[in-house]
Amino acid sequence: MSRRRQFDDEDEVQMKRRRGAPLIEDVEKKLQGVIGKVGENTGSSIECNLDKLTAFLHDDLEKYRASIIDIIAGCAIYLPNRVTVYTTLVGLLNSKNFNFGGDVVEKLISEQQDLLSKQKYQEAQNLAIFLCDLGNSGVLTAQSIGEYLESFIAAAFEENMPQVRNDYYIQTVLRCLPWIGKELTEKAPEQMENIGEAIGKYLELRNKNHVALLQVWREGSTDQKQEDYLESLSAQIEALRNADWVENHIPRHYSGFETTLQDALQHNLPSFQSPEHTSDMIYPYPLVVFRLFQDADCSAFSSKPLPGDSSIDRFLFEGEIAWIIEKNQFNRKACARELLAFAEENPSVPIGFLIFETIFGQMLRLPHAPYPAIFHCSLVLELLKLKPDDYPQILVQTVECIYRRADSMQPVCIDRMVDWFSFHLSNFQYRYTWTDWKDCLNKDAFSGSQIFVREVIEKCRRFGSYEKIIAALPQDFVKIHPCSPEVRYLIDEEDTALVQRAETFTQMFQERQPAEAFLNELKSNDENDELPYNINEFGLFVMVMLKMASKTYSHNFSALFRYQTTLKTVCDASELYQEKLLETLYSCWKTNQQMLMILTDKLLKMQVIDCSAVVGWLFDEKMWQEHDRQWLFEVLNQALEKLTRQINVVEKDIKELTEKTENKIKEEDDEESDIKMDEDETKEEKFKQDLEDLENNKEKLERMVTFQKGLFNDFLIAFIEEIKNAATSNTSEMDGSGDTPGTQTPKFMWLRGRFCHVLLAHAETLLKHSSNIADEVFSEGTDPSIIECFNQFQSLRL
């Protein structure tokens, strides 16, 4: 953008002023455009643009004061990459109009309190950094900023508060220090010393049980640090302090106006008042820093040094990359362009490596990735398109680094890598140097590397044809080739009676007979049978139906809908029929995992089966053989999540009905005494109906929550039993030596990781019931490492 174009908007505002009074909204839009663009790259320097913008805005301060303050507050919240641009602007305006600076500070404090009450923690943190940086631009005194940060520290030391709340306040202080640390050290050294000591004391006393649970790789299995986020940031701040607060990333535009700003009158920043904690407040989960590359990993591709782990520059670069991604999370093309522009603005650092490290760090973040998987997948593709000479090599290095550590990787992170890499390969005709990974073929079936490669191949099969995938693989990989995804029709041809019954059902399907006919055909003729329908013939009925509908997904859906009444009537009669239905579904579509997953989900949506039947089936001993496969845990988590969503809907209905009835009662209390409720019978009846609905929903919620608790307890007990069984098997599946302790075998470590995966996948629900689970699920014989895993999980919300 040219310098002339930047200030065309200002000229337009001036022309409208001369022509007559413009619409206020038009002027506000122009002001927003002018202020919002001041930090952009233009033909002139940012300092020059700030100087001109200050002169322009000063003329309008009295007329549009509120609008200008609102716009600056918005920039402070949503443009954190331009903090110093806008703090300099406020400083220059404050030097010309002291009251304006005070009004801005008052507005920012009010906005911060509002954001915290709405639990918008990142935005509130952006304002804290902005307020602190106002000390560098001559708006606020260093003494008051020190007191402001000390009030955050005090909030973190309040008694009987969740650790995650206290962590947030300490993190806020640490994040402010790269901007204001030098100023505080020079002008408020005693406060700076107090802040440093208090943070050190807090970190020393803090519970760190959660760290191992949130690490992508098992502790001690890699040379890369997997530090707690607060510990890492504190170490970076300490290194910065020892370097006399010298960093190379923050553009301090106010230094160009030092003479003007140092003579300005300064304001005092009020102390921070932490919002009252309530039980329904949800704070950010603790984080573990993700590191993939060291300087040696980059040396083959770039002569530029990578900032070290303890360097504050690493933190600042990662923060800006993360912000660019957050801002453009709905536009992959714009996101990729801005990331490349950021890399070009910082030629002295191999930003490409930090971009991929940040993307994969987000993709693998525990307990939840911040963005949908498809966004990260498409963003990587877009980056490769825009930088085809460099970024493909960095991506290959990224994949190889992760593959080398796959054996110690959390199962849920392997799942995410499988989802991304299979999608990625589908855009390149599944071409890859597969032979580089043939070492996994000689490892245990439960080793992370073999599971990763096997599941990638299976997922690729879902994206493309079976023949195409097999053709792309080396001959050596036949051991982990997926089976042909065809329906299996397992009927013993020598059993004449069984064949005849199958033919009967086939003919009935062809004649499209109604549900009643099938129900009559399935009725048990055995007087001693306690079940109303013959369970074996029901399994045969399902098998024939699936065989006849096996051509496409649409045929399967059509069959399920056509015979929904038959299926539901039989399955409602006993849980045993639901088990039989799922067992038959598995036996027919065992080699087509995608069909298994889709049809199970469809049966749940149609309410033919319920969540408990699915969970019981998946953790039946007969299904243990599938517990090294990704599809099983996808089905499990979908079923459990479906129940949680149903509970959330009922909770929402209760909240709305409660508000509705309370408002109605309040309205009646506010009415004049001569107006009675019985004068309007319709309102009275509606009010009674709302109260009745509210009570019914409360009872329904209580039943559902009780059912959910029982379901989780039963399933976790079954899972622990399987893990216990794996621990008692002291022989590695591959070497047969019997020298490997049961709790160190790949199978045990994998199942333990899956146990952690389920806890994290349903963290919000399970944390509500964690005390109940601890009492009812764990027994004296439970493996200590499983109890340790659960204790780590509980510490997420300490």
Curated annotation (Swiss-Prot):
Residues 28-241 form the MIF4G domain. It holds the Pfam family MIF4G_like. Residues 668-682 have a biased composition (Acidic residues). It is found in: Nucleus. It comes from the Eukaryota. GO terms for cellular component: nuclear cap binding complex; nucleus. Residues 663-686 are annotated as: Disordered. GO terms for molecular function: mRNA binding; RNA cap binding. InterPro entries: ARM-type_fold, CBP80, MIF4G-like_typ-1, MIF4G-like_typ-2, MIF4G-like_typ-3. Component of the cap-binding complex (CBC), which binds cotranscriptionally to the 5'-cap of pre-mRNAs and is involved in various processes such as pre-mRNA splicing and RNA-mediated gene silencing (RNAi). The CBC complex is involved in miRNA-mediated RNA interference and is required for primary microRNAs (miRNAs) processing. In the CBC complex, ncbp-1 does not bind directly capped RNAs (m7GpppG-capped RNA) but is required to stabilize the movement of the N-terminal loop of ncbp-2 and lock the CBC into a high affinity cap-binding state with the cap structure. Component of the nuclear cap-binding complex (CBC), a heterodimer composed of ncbp-1 and ncbp-1 that interacts with m7GpppG-capped RNA. Belongs to the NCBP1 family. This is Nuclear cap-binding protein subunit 1. It comes from Caenorhabditis elegans.
